[in-house]
Amino acid sequence: SAIACSVDSMKYMCKRFSVMIISYDKMNQLRHVRFLKNKEGVLAHMAKHRRRLVPCFDAVKTAFNEELTPCGDIAHWTNPKGGYFISLYVMPGCAKRVAQLCKDCGLTLTGAGSAYPYHKDPDDAHLRIAPTYPSLDEVETASDLLCVCVRLAAVEKLLAEKA
C-alpha cells in the first residue's frame, strides 16, 4: 500500500497506524456481538445448530452401524458428543482408496489423513467425516455410498493379501 498526502496528514496517519495491529476482522466481530448479544444468545444459537446437525450425525452413525458393523473389523468410528466431525477408521492402508472410490462416484470427502500433521496418517486409516453442510437427504445418500466404498476397499485389500 501507499499513501500520498501532506506532512500534517502523514503525521496524523502515522499516529493512527501506530496503534493498529494485524488481527481478525473487527467489523465481523462487531456484527457477531450485536447479533448474539451475550452468553445466552450464543447458547440459544448453538442450540439451533444442534437441532439441525443431530439428525445428520445420526444418519451417518445409523449407516455405519447397519452397513459396516455386520462386516466385522473393517471399520470403527467415534461417537462425538459435540463438534463437527466423526472420525472413521478403516482398515490400515485403505483410507486413501476409500476417498478415491468416493471421489470416482462424485462424493468429495475431507482428504484422507487430514486430521494428522501434514495429512500424513502413518496407517492410512483415518477419514474425517463432516456431515454439517449437506441436507439430511444428501447425508443419508452419501453415508450409504461411503459404506459401499469402505466395504469395497476392504475386500480389495483382503484379496490382495491372499494373492
Give the role of each language-model region.
Residues 1-163:
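PLP-dependent class I/II
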